[in-house]
Regions:
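A conserved structural motif in NAD(P)-dependent oxidoreductases
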Residues: 74-86
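Active-site helix of classical SDR
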Residues: 10, 18
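Short, flexible catalytic-loop segment of classical short-chain dehydrogenase/reductase
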Residues: 37-47, 51-52, 56
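Active-site loop immediately N-terminal to the catalytic Tyr-X3-Lys motif
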Residues: 1-5, 27-28, 96
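Conserved SDR Rossmann-fold cofactor-binding beta-strand/turn motif
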Residues: 31-41, 94, 107-109
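A short C-terminal helix-loop "cap" of Rossmann-like NAD(P)-dependent dehydrogenase/epimerase domains
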Residues: 50-75
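Short C-terminal tail/terminal secondary-structure segment
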Residues: 91, 102-115
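Short, small/polar-rich loop/turn modules that mediate ligand/substrate recognition or access, typified
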Residues: 26, 31, 101-103
């Protein structure tokens, strides 16, 4: 897909910022982490413009038409995660169970990063 450089650069920059802040704020017992998801079932993903980018071979592709394309992105056989999956990761990171977790880019990515 064309024109992903700004998006990818911004994501990489945020990870660097998170790690730097985690180091700088650790002495104050402030934890800084990020959640790095794969594709998430949201309007940013599920819209006619994206459908057209993913299936240029079709005149008017639908959400159903792009599911096989999305499935190829992840190691687990799913097209995308749900917003609740991201929420659960955030709730874990802010919980006492993660009280010593800092500087972590937590993937909620169905194996996208290892594929």
């Amino acid at each position: 897909m064309p024109n992903l450089a700004p998006y990818g650069s911004a994501k990489a920059g945020l990870t660097g910022l998170m790690r730097t802040l985690a180091l700088e704020l650790a002495e104050h017992s402030i934890r800084v982490n990020s959640v790095n998801p794969t594709t998430v079932a949201t309007p940013m993903l599920q819209n006619p413009v994206n459908f057209g980018l993913l299936r240029p071979d079709l005149d008017d592709p639908t959400a159903e038409d792009v599911l096989p394309v999305y499935r190829t992105l992840n190691a687990l056989p799913i097209p995308y995660v749900q917003a609740d999956d991201i929420r659960n990761a955030v709730l874990f990171l802010v919980s006492d169970e993660a009280r010593y977790v800092t500087g972590v880019a937590l993937p909620v990515d169905a194996g996208y990063a290892v594929k």
